[in-house]
Amino acid sequence: MKQGIIKNVKIRHVAAGDLDACFTIESTCYTTDAATREKIEKRIAIFPAGFLVAEANGQVIGMINSGATNKDDITDDAFKDMADHIHDGKHIVIFSLAVLPAFQGVGISRRLMDMFIEASRDLKKEKILLMCKSGLISYYLKYDFLYAGKSKSTLGGFEWHEMYLPFVFDNGGQS
């Protein structure tokens, strides 16, 4: 059944009506580091261009969301509350990439990441930045992210690692 779902998955920008589903995904896939419903609502309202969902048969089953900034230091936890979000910032910062457990393992997170990377390029961002746990470093390396080192963030009581994906545009340089 899972394999058949992937054919029916549509990746699209978030809509206000997706809030409850996105909060369910966030709270199911994350523990003490999960964003609150209010934070997700704020991300949807402030930066829908940086928020994609995966939908199968009318159900939102996965998401990726972000904010934009001119800062290189993304360890300030207030940023996840969109405190320093700048729509036209040079960097886009991934906050969450999550797929409901029943739909994991069939390429949905890959489709979300591929579309997110394409959308970030279209927005002319210089880099995608993120923090991840140790177990996800190899996942992001598959997308050509570079490892920047251990983060000073201790969000949720976890050890985090910083990674980034620089973009090179047609003019031969970065944007």
Predicted regions and their residues:
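A short beta-loop-alpha structural element at the N-terminal edge
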Residues: 8-21
